[in-house]
Amino acid sequence: GDLPVCGETCFGGTCNTPGCVCAWPVCTR
């Protein structure tokens, strides 16, 4: 299956997308 795409803006070090981590200011895998 396809993995979720990371890239949302993150605040407080948390990302809503599973498997993504906050690399301020955006989420990345």
Curated annotation (Swiss-Prot):
Disulfides per UniProt = C6-C20, C10-C22, C15-C27
- Keyword Disulfide bond among record annotations: yes
Q: What does the record's free text say on domains? A: The presence of a 'disulfide through disulfide knot' structurally defines this protein as a knottin.
One Pfam match, given by its short name, reads Cyclotide
Q: Where is this cross-link: Cyclopeptide (Gly-Arg)?
A: G1-R29
Q: Which UniProt keywords apply?
A: Disulfide bond, Knottin, Plant defense
Xref: InterPro entries: Cyclotide, Cyclotide_moebius_CS, Cyclotide_sf
State the family named in the UniProt similarity comment for this chain.
Answer: Belongs to the cyclotide family. Moebius subfamily.
Job of this protein: Probably participates in a plant defense mechanism.
Q: Does the keyword rRNA-binding apply?
A: no
Q: Highest taxon of the source?
A: Eukaryota
Sorted alphabetically, the Gene Ontology BP terms of this entry are: defense response
Q: What is this protein called?
A: Cyclotide psyleio C
Coiled coil located at which positions? none
Q: What is the lineage of its organism?
A: Eukaryota, Viridiplantae, Streptophyta, Embryophyta, Tracheophyta
**What PROSITE patterns does UniProt report for this protein, alphabetically?**
CYCLOTIDE (PS51052), CYCLOTIDE_MOEBIUS (PS60009)
Question: Can you summarize the PTM annotation of this record?
Answer: This is a cyclic peptide.
